[in-house]
């Protein structure tokens, strides 16, 4: 596949807050650009463009790139260059397994701690998802989707749980941003989220777990459609 140079891949409003840790911000900004496909698979990463845009030295950018390479989101090729990694099919499956296992265990614990206020927070996120879907704001929809799952994970009482899940699903997230949603995809996701919330509101463990696993499995099945449509963005089997 021909490589494209990722010139000016960062959002215009991507800025560094000098009062916070610069390396961590550089990492988050670059990771977000890769996850949302603003820096697409196979693109050449030009350090100077990034440092000029963010107004920082090359050191934090290089540190961020090394972290992203550890996550297999970036390929560093000595004497050749640095590239955004293709979406790894094996990592997709691995991410699915990790996410499914941890979210199922997390929601079981969350069910022991959930109160009416938490149920209302989840319902509020459903409303925000519905608004984003009605206005075709796909990136906002995904953000609220993640907030929904993060809220449940945090209810488990384990503060690191969502961070582990979020890191493991990086390749899955890239697929989510690949194109406009498939027909009725967002409506289905909202309905599935609603089923999860209502089961949790009733403190029904079996229905809660079934609703969550159905939602996660259905979401993963859609990746096969996008894999065929965008084969050039994926590694070969």
Mark where each language-model region is.
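Short helix-capping and inter-helix turn/linker motifs at the boundaries of alpha-helical repeat units
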Residues: 21, 119-120, 184-187
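C-terminal regulatory/effector modules of DNA-binding transcriptional regulators
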Residues: 2, 182-237
């Amino acid at each position: 596949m021909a490589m494209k140079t990722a010139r000016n891949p960062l959002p215009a409003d991507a800025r560094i807050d000098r009062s916070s840790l610069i390396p961590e911000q550089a990492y988050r900004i670059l990771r977000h650009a890769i996850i949302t496909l603003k820096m697409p698979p196979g693109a050449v990463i030009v350090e100077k463009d990034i440092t000029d845009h963010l107004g920082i030295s090359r050191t934090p950018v290089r540190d961020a790139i090394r972290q992203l390479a550890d996550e297999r989101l970036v390929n560093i090729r000595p004497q050749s260059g640095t590239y955004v990694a293709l979406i790894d099919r094996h990592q997709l499956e691995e991410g699915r397994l990790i996410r499914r296992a941890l979210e199922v265990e997390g929601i079981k614990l969350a069910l022991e701690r959930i109160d009416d206020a938490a149920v209302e927070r989840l319902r509020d996120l459903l409303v925000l998802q519905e608004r984003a879907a009605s206005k075709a704001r796909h990136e906002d929809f995904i953000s609220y989707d993640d907030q929904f799952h993060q809220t449940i994970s945090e209810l488990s009482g384990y503060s690191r749980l969502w961070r582990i899940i979020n890191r493991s699903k990086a390749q899955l997230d890239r697929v989510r941003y690949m194109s406009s949603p498939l027909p009725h995809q967002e409506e289905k996701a909202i309905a599935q989220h609603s089923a999860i919330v209502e089961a949790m509101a009733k403190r029904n463990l079996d229905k809660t777990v079934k609703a969550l696993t159905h939602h996660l499995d259905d979401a993963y099945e859609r990746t096969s459609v996008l894999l065929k449509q965008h084969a050039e963005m994926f590694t070969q089997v």
